[in-house]
Amino acid sequence: MSKQLTAQAPVDPIVLGKMGSSYGIRGWLRVFSSTEDAESIFDYQPWFIQKAGQWQQVQLESWKHHNQDMIIKLKGVDDRDAANLLTNCEIVVDSSQLPQLEEGDYYWKDLMGCQVVTTEGYDLGKVIDMMETGSNDVLVIKANLKDAFGIKERLVPFLDGQVIKKVDLTTRSIEVDWDPGF
């Protein structure tokens, strides 16, 4: 595989997916997309992977659906052994490639690390992850060490207007209407 270190390595890397196991003997790999529409992962190029702490650009040659999976063929990955070396590599792009969002919409990456405070001023903790459920996204909040309720982690639905009262990315804070006991 022709892996090349590039001067255009992502400045603000964001993970869009992950390469899975190899498929067949000609260098195809399963791909798992983290984008809202799974096929949207192919709209963002170039892709980067990180091997031994170094960014490497990879070129998508082809992709297709196979049963319930999507499989990809990367340029220079021509056999099963080469494909196996890429198993579990994260697919990364620079965040500058992502489209600008409308007011009130947020990328999950921008919410990570935000401090979450109730409308009454109680500090719930910091956002450490997001979950997608069938009906709405959910903030996963790591509670402060000395949480008065002894809670280590909270799940708060991201319901704009109902639960989420204010998001301020400048101050990295989210105000919520939420009972700290939950």
Curated annotation (Swiss-Prot):
Keywords: Chaperone, Cytoplasm, Ribosome biogenesis, rRNA processing. It holds the Pfam family RimM. Its main location: cytoplasm. GO terms for molecular function: ribosome binding. GO terms for cellular component: cytoplasm; ribosome. Residues 102-182 form the PRC barrel domain. GO terms for biological process: ribosomal small subunit biogenesis; rRNA processing. Transmembrane segments: none annotated. It is found in: Cytoplasm. It comes from the Bacteria. The keyword DNA damage does not apply. Binds ribosomal protein uS19. An accessory protein needed during the final step in the assembly of 30S ribosomal subunit, possibly for assembly of the head region. Essential for efficient processing of 16S rRNA. May be needed both before and after RbfA during the maturation of 16S rRNA. It has affinity for free ribosomal 30S subunits but not for 70S ribosomes. Belongs to the RimM family. This is Ribosome maturation factor RimM. The lineage of its organism: Bacteria, Pseudomonadati, Pseudomonadota, Gammaproteobacteria, Enterobacterales.
